[in-house]
């Protein structure tokens, strides 16, 4: 996507293929080549110099030292011990000890909308069956890994599974379980250890049947030492299990990789971000365009609940449908369920995924009977009049109409902005569909505030970066933000 008015499609598992990974070539700056680049574009300039700088990946060349370090066990340590607070160092030969950094520093950890996985959460490794969508890639001639998926001075890559065995990489990090980020991961994966959040690790086993021996789950807000580099996962406010990844190198250099995220005020209170230096920010720039200024998640949820109640007052026999991806948008249908006091119907595959979260708010409110509740969750691709009409026919004895919500940032309109009451639904016969701008990515204004809060030395966009002109527009925004 460039700075035009055309929206990108999102795939059935969550996000769009956001870094141009379907293209076959890269430009001279290491970005995926885009044919839309103008022929008369200047070869030199800020963007060119910026992206050429620091792109020497000789540090990733595999050598004996790297190979040796890759087989060492991951070490986990407490930040308060490093800072002189009293706590015994964990014995790395014993089972890994988990320490909440917020508790260590005497801070109260913000609670998410839904409950985090408890210690009693069930862990399942059963597979959902074969995926209709093949997320594998050709092993015969895998494309070279783009530089912006590698971390300089480390043997690490982030969300770089479709490139096969990346030379010099001894640790593959996954920010979250959306297909455009895990593409390339299959049960046959054998290229190296995978590091991700605990919830994401359960989804890898459940949905993709990835070998558990390849997966190394990390808890949020716990510092780990991997190949001598300190790594901490931070809540990303995107989808369940999504994490920002904070890397601190031996020389003190700090990288923050956002994966996909929605910036929030709570992030600014995190001990690793508040008054801390970030040298390089790998930024989710999905909506890095001045036209995007989303209403808050809370405002959208309140709007959805109000519309639902108003609709039911007029037509009590209404079936409520919420579109969703494999994961994501849970807050929307959970808000409706709580407001109406009803359970949530989803098919068996989705129920297994939702139950794997270990969140009581969802697990206790799931129904196996579509006739027993008026709230159904369907794939986002099913939110079309024809498909909803077919769905209604199945329950025609209980319901006479359908009210559906398509919650995605791509429904955003500048004319509506934050004025949600201006939204006009699509209505045909017994079907009414509301597109609501419930985004799990940062809006332009939220990106600006986050960048101005962190004030990094360098920003590397990870989305919509396949066009040099678009990159220059984004860099122009970054320069303007950091002047203030």
UniProtKB/Swiss-Prot annotation:
Q: What is the role of this chain?
A: May be required for repair of DNA lesions formed after exposure to oxidative stress.
Keyword DNA damage among UniProt keywords: yes
Which lineage ranks, top first, belong to the organism behind this chain? Eukaryota, Viridiplantae, Streptophyta, Embryophyta, Tracheophyta
Q: Where is the composition biased (Acidic residues)?
A: 1-11
Chief location bin: nucleus
Q: Name one Pfam family in it.
A: DRMBL
Q: Name one GO cellular component term.
A: nucleus
- Protein name in the entry: DNA cross-link repair protein SNM1
Question: Which signals induce this protein?
Answer: Induced by bleomycin, methyl methane sulphonate and hydrogen peroxide, which are known to induce oxidative lesions in DNA. Also induced by bacterial flagellin, which is known to elicit plant defense responses and a rapid oxidative burst, and by xylanase.
User: DNA repair as a keyword?
Assistant: yes
Family listed: Belongs to the DNA repair metallo-beta-lactamase (DRMBL) family.
Region of interest called Disordered, as start-end residue ranges on this chain: 1-27, 109-141
Example GO BP: DNA repair
> According to its UniProt record, where is this protein located?
Nucleus
Show the ranges annotated as biased composition (Polar residues): 109-127
Q: Which organism is it from?
A: Arabidopsis thaliana
Q: Which domain of life is it from?
A: Eukaryota
The protein's matches in Gene3D superfamilies, at most eight in alphabetical order, are given as: 3.40.50.12650, Ribonuclease Z/Hydroxyacylglutathione hydrolase-like (3.60.15.10)
Entry keywords, A to Z: DNA damage, DNA repair, Nucleus
């Amino acid at each position: 996507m460039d700075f035009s008015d055309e929206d990108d499609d999102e795939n059935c598992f969550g996000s769009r293929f956001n870094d141009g990974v379907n293209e076959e070539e890269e430009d001279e700056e290491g970005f995926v080549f885009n044919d839309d680049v103008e022929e008369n574009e200047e070869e030199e300039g800020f963007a060119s110099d910026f992206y050429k700088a620091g792109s020497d990946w000789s540090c990733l060349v595999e050598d004996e030292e790297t190979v040796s370090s890759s087989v060492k066990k991951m070490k986990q340590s407490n930040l308060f011990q490093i800072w002189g607070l009293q706590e015994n160092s964990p014995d790395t030969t014993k089972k890994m000890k988990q320490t909440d950094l917020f508790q260590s520093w005497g801070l109260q950890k913000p609670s998410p909308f839904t409950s985090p996985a408890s210690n009693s959460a069930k862990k399942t490794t059963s597979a959902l069956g074969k995926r209709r969508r093949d997320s594998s890639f050709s092993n015969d001639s895998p494309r070279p890994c783009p530089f912006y998926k590698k971390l300089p001075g480390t043997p690490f890559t982030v969300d770089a599974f479709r490139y096969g065995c990346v030379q010099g990489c001894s640790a593959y990090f996954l920010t979250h379980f959306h297909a455009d980020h895990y593409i390339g991961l299959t049960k046959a994966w054998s290229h190296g250890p995978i590091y991700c959040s605990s919830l994401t690790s359960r989804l890898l086993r459940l949905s993709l049947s990835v070998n558990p021996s390849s997966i190394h789950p990390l808890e949020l807000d716990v510092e780990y030492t991997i190949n001598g580099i300190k790594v901490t996962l931070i809540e990303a406010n995107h989808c369940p299990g999504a994490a920002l990844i904070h890397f601190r190198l031996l020389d003190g250099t700090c990288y923050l990789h956002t994966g996909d995220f929605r910036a929030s005020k709570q992030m600014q209170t995190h001990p690793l971000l508040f008054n801390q230096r970030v040298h390089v920010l790998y930024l989710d720039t999905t909506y890095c365009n001045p036209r995007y200024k989303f209403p808050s998640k809370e405002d959208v949820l309140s709007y959805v609940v109000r519309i639902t109640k108003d609709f039911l007052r007029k037509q009590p026999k209404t079936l409520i449908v919420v579109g969703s991806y494999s994961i994501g948008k849970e807050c929307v249908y959970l808000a409706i369920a709580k407001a109406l006091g009803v359970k949530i119907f989803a098919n068996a595959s989705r129920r297994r995924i939702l139950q794997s979260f270990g969140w009581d708010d969802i697990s206790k409110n799931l129904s196996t009977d579509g006739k027993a509740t008026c709230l159904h969750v369907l794939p986002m691709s099913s939110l079309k009049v024809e498909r909803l009409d077919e769905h209604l026919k199945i329950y025609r004895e209980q319901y006479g109409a359908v009210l559906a919500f398509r919650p995605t940032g791509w429904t955003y309109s500048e004319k509506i902005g934050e004025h949600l009451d201006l939204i006009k639904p699509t209505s045909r016969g017994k079907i009414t569909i509301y597109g609501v701008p419930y985004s799990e990515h940062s809006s332009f204004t939220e990106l600006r505030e986050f960048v101005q809060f962190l004030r990094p030395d360098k920003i590397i966009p990870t989305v919509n970066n396949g066009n040099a002109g678009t990159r220059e527009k984004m860099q122009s925004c970054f320069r303007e933000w950091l002047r203030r």
